């Protein structure tokens, strides 16, 4: 499985002909190295409807005939705009061609059309990826670790709108993933974080690896 960090909260997973993109905020993303026309996902997963996460999702979905997977409110809003969508909600699971999606809670807003914000645990060709979305720390992350053995947790660390790096270390302790990757930081001055210090803290305080990717970087997970 290839994991690519596009920037902010946007991450893409690829395996064979399957591509999943989370929160494709690309064209107006000041740290992204590509444009929305450079991605061609089969599936788009939206954690919430704020502009810095919804981003270019609707246009990408129309251009590529992608299936948008999100909460019922977001899926309904997308369908009204001509996008193919599958509605889910917190606590729900669903099998797809690539594997399984579980919708998890997130402590955040979503935008007027968005309902509740969420996260996802995606079993993508046998690798379990937890994208927390925008969220504060919450103790029920421990339940997520009881339900799923996570290979990599993608966690926000920028503070202000989400948990910061210190809380993300605690989240890692709750989730017990094999690896963790920080996102949603240093996009703007309002959400600063020291990713090298975060990596050091993860190494010292958890049993997880930490992968710090710059926007445009990718890695293989075997």
Swiss-Prot record:
GO molecular function annotations of the record: hydrolase activity
Pfam families referenced in this protein's UniProt entry, alphabetically: Lactamase_B_2 (PF12706)
InterPro entries listed in its UniProt record: Metallo-B-lactamas, RibonucZ/Hydroxyglut_hydro, UPF0173, UPF0173_UPF0282_UlaG_hydrolase
SUPFAM superfamilies, per the entry: Metallo-hydrolase/oxidoreductase
Keywords, in A-Z order: Hydrolase
Similarity annotation: Belongs to the UPF0173 family.
Protein name, per record: UPF0173 metal-dependent hydrolase Nther_2337
């Amino acid at each position: 499985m290839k994991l690519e960090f596009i920037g902010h909260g946007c991450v893409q997973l690829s395996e064979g002909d399957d591509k999943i993109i989370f929160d494709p905020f690309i064209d107006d993303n000041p740290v992204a190295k590509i444009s929305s026309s450079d991605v061609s996902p089969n599936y788009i997963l939206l954690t919430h409807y704020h502009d810095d996460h919804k981003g270019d999702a609707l246009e990408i979905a129309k251009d590529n005939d992608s299936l948008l997977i999100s909460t019922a409110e977001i899926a309904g809003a997308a369908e009204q705009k001509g996008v193919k969508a599958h509605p889910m909600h917190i606590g729900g699971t669903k099998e797809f061609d690539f594997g399984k999606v579980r919708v998890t809670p997130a402590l955040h807003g979503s935008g007027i059309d968005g309902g509740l914000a969420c996260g996802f645990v995606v079993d993508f060709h046998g690798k379990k990826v937890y994208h927390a979305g925008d969220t504060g720390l919450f103790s029920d992350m421990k339940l997520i670790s009881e339900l799923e053995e996570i290979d990599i947790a993608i966690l926000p660390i920028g503070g202000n709108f989400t948990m910061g790096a210190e809380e993300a270390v605690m989240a890692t302790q709750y989730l017990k993933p094999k690896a963790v990757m920080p996102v949603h930081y240093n996009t703007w001055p309002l959400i600063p974080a020291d990713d090298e210090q975060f990596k050091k803290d993860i190494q010292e305080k958890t049993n997880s690896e930490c992968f710090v990717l710059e926007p445009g970087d990718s890695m293989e997970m075997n």
